[in-house]
Every structure is written in C-alpha cells, then in structure tokens.
Amino acid sequence: MKKKPFYKVLYVQVIFAIIVGVILGHFYPALATDMKPLGDGFIKLIKMVIGPIIFCTVVTGIAGMEDMKKVGRVGGKALLYFEVVSTFALLLGLAATHILRPGVGFNIDPATLDGKAVASYAAKAHGQSTVDFLLHIIPNTMVDAFAQGEILQILLIALLFGSVLAHLGERGKVVTDFIDGLTRVLFGIVHIVTKLAPIGAFGAMAFTIGKYGVGSLVPLLKLIGTFYLTSIVFVLVVLGTIARVTGFSIIRFVSYIKEELLIVLGTSSSEAALPQLMEKLEKAGCSRSVVGLVVPTGYSFNLDGTNIYMTMAVLFIAQATNIELTWMQQLTLLAVAMLTSKGASGVTGAGFITLAATLAVVPTIPLSGMVLILGIDRFMSECRALTNIVGNGVATVVVSAWEKELDRNKLRQALAGGGEVKTTEAAGV
C-alpha cells in the first residue's frame, strides 16, 4: 500500500495545528480567544457519539459471552487493578512533592488568599457525597442517561441490556445483530469527525494561550514541571513495568496511540479520544467484551493523572503556606483521595472539584489555598488527561491478558506498525 504524504497524516496535522494555535495565542491573544468555539465544537461532536458507542460495544460484548459469571469476573479484575494502580499514583504524587518540594519558598499567608474564586468548586465538592455518587449511577430514565451523556449511567443500562440478550440467546440474535451493525455505523461517524481534530486542537490551544498567556506559567513553573515529570515517571516506570510483565513495551504502546494522545493534548479532554481508543485496542488484540467493560469504567475509576495531581496539589498548597502535615494527616489524605477521585470524570471541572472535596476533609490546609493553582490548572489538565488515557489503555490490555483474551499476534503486529507476524503466539512485544 502506498504510504501517505506526511502532511496527510493526522498526528502531523494535529501537531502543526497545536503549534499554530500557540503562535496565534501568544502574538494575537484577542483573536485567539475567539477560536474557543472550534475546540468546543470538536469535543461536542465526539461526545455526541460516546454514549451510543459505549452502549453498543458493551451490549454486543456481553451478549456474546456464554457465561454471565465472566462479566462479574472481568469487572472485578478491572476494579482490583484500578485500585492498586491508583494507589501507586497517589503515593508517587506524595513522594515527588516531598522530594522536589515545589511549594517551598512561596511563604504565602493563608489569611491573604481570596477564596471567592474557588467557592463554586467547593460547593460542588460538598454536594457530591458517596451516597449521592452511587445514586447518580441510576438514571431517572434511559433517555435521560443518553441525553446527559452520563457514562456510568449508560454503562449500567448496557450491562442490563446485554445481560438480558445473553439470557435470550438465539431469540435475541436479531437485536444483537442490529446493535452490532449500529456499532459499525457509529465508528464510521467517528472516523469522519476525527478528520476535524486539527481544527479542534488549534481552537482549544489558541484559546488557552490567548487567555492565560505563556507568562502566567512562570511563577508556578516548578509545580507544573514537577507534575509533568512525575507523570512521565509514572507512565515509564509504573505502567512500563506492568506492560513489561504483561509482555509488551510501553514505549511502543504510547507510539501506537499517538494520534489519540495528540487529540487529547490539543483539546485537554480524554473523552475526545475515547471512541478511537476503544477501536485501537480491539485492533491490538483485546476482546470487544473486555474493551467495552474496562475502558468506560476506567474513565471514572482509573484516573491515574488525576490521582497524581491531587496528592501533589494538596502537598504543594501546604508547602506554599508553610503548613506541616503529620504522617497521619498524609495517610488520611491518601485514604480520602482514593475515594474522592472515583467518578471524577462525570463532573464538570473534575480535577479541581475533586481537589476541593479532598481538601475539605483535611481542615489543616485552607480551602482558599486552591487559588494558588487555579490559574495554572488549565495547563496541567493536558497532562492529567494524557496520563489517564495511557493508564486506561494499559489497563485494558492487562485485563485482556488476565482473561486470556489477548491476541498477542495482533498486539505485536499493531505495536510493530502493522508488519507481518508469525502465527505462533509471541512471548513478548
């Protein structure tokens, strides 16, 4: 097959669009801020099909399972994996902040901080208790779940729908075939919308730089650098070790999903690449049933980047305001963060709202301290989203391997760039 010219390759177009967006935002900020609808429009187009795609993928995956116990087994393994890896992410955030101490030297007096700017985030955080979160998973109506684009609600409906179809067997085959065909149509729509990714990335990046300016990063550059460095270490060391044990290379995996990562980088939304990620994972040898269960669930329960950010941000505020936290308080912070981070993707301004919820349970640190990082949160959200999407991709491959539903030949071929492979199963990639 003839190779595409480099300028027609999607990730090259996205990189170029991001660079142009940065230039426009820096030199013509007023014009750049007007580009925001381009980024918002692209994300809305993607979100338009996320709900139906998750529903169809999960339903066809479960309907194709002969043993319904398998659904519970896959879900249980996924949740166990999420909890263990999330704990590593939280601990790494704490450790990195202790070692690099990005907040030391600020000497901020908490009494001088104006908490009005974060009041709305704090209010939302207080309004989301554990019981509220669990009840929120149950939609008022099936239509309402799709209309609001609530991933966990759609996942619940899909689990019930798929379970019934699996129970019906041949009698439900007509419905299963219809949903399978609908899945193909929806992914076709995604392919069309994805071609607009450079425009969306340009608009989102131009707005960010135009509104906040590169100069606004300088005073808090140490925190941003610490967060990005810690996230890279997490991906290469923690996820890299998990990947190596499972039998593939994290570097090759990241390279395989580079188009999805660039879309996330440009839009600062991990949801913008969810449909493409699911399709890529299936092509890489993960079974549809595992992809359908693990990826959507991971978007609420496996937010590795958000976990690193939360413990790091809390400790940064403590350091900046010269507040010493005891080890017991830090263990409390860790335990609270493990709970507040779950379901964060279902809330607007997720990272900041979860941070407010965590701080509310550690009264030693003033909630008004969030003002210190409010201005740079937008610049850190890209790294959160990138780490989250890599983490969910790795989780899906790992759970597929645990279930012995990972086609290693397909995985090896995909990560090698689509070259020919032997039919014998590879020991590693």
Swiss-Prot record:
Q: Which family does it belong to?
A: Belongs to the dicarboxylate/amino acid:cation symporter (DAACS) (TC 2.A.23) family.
Fetch the Gene3D superfamilies from UniProt.
Sodium:dicarboxylate symporter (1.10.3860.10)
Entry GO terms, CC: plasma membrane
Name this polypeptide is given = C4-dicarboxylate transport protein
Q: Which NCBIfam families match?
A: PRK01663.1, PRK13027.1
The gene is: dctA
Query: HAMAP family, alphabetically?
Result: C4_dicarb_transport
Query: Which compartments is it annotated to reside in?
Result: Cell inner membrane
Q: What does this protein do?
A: Responsible for the transport of dicarboxylates such as succinate, fumarate, and malate from the periplasm across the membrane.
GO MF annotation terms? fumarate transmembrane transporter activity; malate:proton symporter activity; succinate transmembrane transporter activity
Which species is listed as the source?
Answer: Burkholderia ambifaria (strain MC40-6)
What's the superkingdom here? Bacteria
Q: Which UniProt keywords apply?
A: Cell inner membrane, Cell membrane, Membrane, Symport, Transmembrane, Transmembrane helix, Transport
Report how it sits in the membrane: Multi-pass membrane protein
Q: Where is the chain membrane-spanning?
A: 9-29, 45-65, 79-99, 149-169, 185-205, 223-243, 308-328, 356-376
GO BP field: L-aspartate transmembrane transport
